[in-house]
Amino acid sequence: MEHVLGFVALAAGLIIGLGAIGACIGIGIMGSKYLESAARQPELMNELQTKMFLLAGLIDAAFLIGVGIAMMFAFANPFVLK
């Protein structure tokens, strides 16, 4: 029983930590590519900015879904039999 709770805490930490790292890297790469393309074609900056913010929201949504799953594992643990 204690091993299951320990592994669930470890898994929740990994889900949140690695998800945050992945989201930060993804948004950083996307932002750099946006700046490159805006410098290359300034007339498309408004259209590209709209798409960039939409994709940033989707990247953050994937991270927040992972946080929700980790919180479900931590507080409403489905792996512990009652």
Swiss-Prot record:
Lineage: superkingdom: Bacteria
MF term (GO), any: proton-transporting ATP synthase activity, rotational mechanism
UniProt KW Ribonucleoprotein keyword: no
Keywords, in A-Z order: ATP synthesis, Cell inner membrane, Cell membrane, CF(0), Hydrogen ion transport, Ion transport, Lipid-binding, Membrane, Transmembrane, Transmembrane helix, Transport
SUPFAM superfamilies: F1F0 ATP synthase subunit C
Membrane spanning residue stretches: 7-27, 53-73
UniProt protein name: ATP synthase subunit c
Annotated organism of origin: Methylibium petroleiphilum (strain ATCC BAA-1232 / LMG 22953 / PM1)
Gene it is expressed from: atpE
